[in-house]
Amino acid sequence: MKTFLFYDVETSGLNPVFDQILTFASIRTDLRLREINRQSVTIQLRGDIVPSPKAFLTHGLTNDELALGIHEYEAALRIHKLVNTPETISLGYNSLGFDDEFLRFMFYRNLLDPYSHQYGNGCSRMDILPIAVVYRVFHADIIKWPEIEGKPSLKLDLIAEANNLVTSGRAHEAMNDVESLIELSKKLFSQEETWHYCLDFFSKTKEEARINRIKSDFQIQNRYFRICIMISLSFGSKVNYMAPVIHLGQSLPYKNQSLWLRLDSEAIPGFGDALNIEDAHVIRKRPGDGLIILPALERFWNRMPASSKQLTDENLEKFCSQCEKFFELIQYHLEYRYPLIPDIDPDASLYQDGFFSGKEKKECEKFHLAGKDRKHEIVDQLQSPRIKILANRILDRNFSKGPLQATSKEYQCHLDQLRSVSEANKIKGYKGDTKYGRHEALEELKELESTFLNPDPDQRKMMAWLNDYIKEF
């Protein structure tokens, strides 16, 4: 039986590669949103994580609460099993933009398949946030939409408050947010035709079929292009969350990416400004990723502001008159490859190193099946360099007790890098970003202390703990 697994996470910071999940809450329902069961997992703060003060002041999780949790490795096994239960559709609120990537990298560094919950055993993913945006555009009367200083907001906690959605806990508490999400989904589900129409945007085959049915009928020289409408929260309320786009084609090195260019930009690099075509912001869409593509039908087109339509006409005219430059822009972005990061940290190497090979999967399985007392022995037998280093980190993070000497030299070096203020010692991610360290946390604390007005007793207690913990890291 197909089921929804609504879930939410609270985390130590905002980086899905290097920060960790602290709490995971889920409620499984049938497809008519009737509850079947619920699960919650609390995870101890890892020894190599410097907590972000802003994150902790937002969710309010205390060190005492986290100390009662389980190690990340055990939590990863438990959560992986939940989202990989056959016929599970896992979904959250902005889950494809945030939570799911946290899950993916947690699974990866704990030697679990980071992608199987997307396609294996009839499993798949969804996200309620893009669906809420569609309702905001086309069925705005379905709920009350909150505003902040006169601007519409789609924040879940504000929607819950504005619509009196019944929950059992505090905002930014994982289970409370899951309850809010299901109550919101029930309201959206009341408009069943739209609900089911939106669900198909998260089916790879159905979404691709929809896009392929849209005619490529805009001609530039001897080539034909699809003009469509894309819907995304990121476009903002000023343009009604809608943007006219032109389909440039499929990425050559990354077959699952289709490339789109916004047509309502006031300046497109390479066309009348000082920038080059390499600087053009091309949207890289993956099937079922929550970027909604609609045909440029009049009833949709007329919901965009006049300025968007005017800029579209002007930009299409530029492309037609400077077609060789436009084709050059297309070819550059179709052929573009992400740069390799030579000193990327092993935790961050998922996209650069790719899927686990068949041999690596067998080594992962061997590690998982070994008892706690035999895992060190198994690690010594591993042949794959990346599996070996990730397995060693699992041991250091989850199975080391006693003095610092109980952990590996590699792990001690990792901790020293987090304490260092030197740029040369930064731990590198796949985007060229770096792992949050003690210096950044102390700077963030200093900023909060000067700007955070009238903290309540719990917040003062949290700030004091963060100050002590980070300084002693």
Named regions from a protein language model:
Residues 70, 85, 472-473:
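Conserved, well-structured beta-alpha core segment at the onset of a catalytic domain
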Residues 69, 97, 175-178, 257, ...:
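Generic detection of long, well-ordered alpha-helical segments
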Residues 18-24, 28-59, 83-193, 361-405, ...:
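Metal-dependent phosphoesterase core characteristic of DEDDh/y 3'-5' exonuclease domains
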Residues 16-21, 27, 47-57, 72, ...:
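Metal-dependent nucleotidyl/phosphoryl-transfer cores and adjacent nucleic-acid-binding surfaces
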Residues 275-399:
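Protein C-terminal end segments and domain termini
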Residues 74-78:
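Well-ordered alpha-helical segments embedded in enzymatic catalytic cores
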Residues 1-71, 81, 249-287:
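Conserved RNase H-like, two-metal-ion catalytic cores of nucleic-acid enzymes
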Residues 186-317, 418-473:
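Acidic two-metal-ion nuclease catalytic site recognized across multiple nuclease folds
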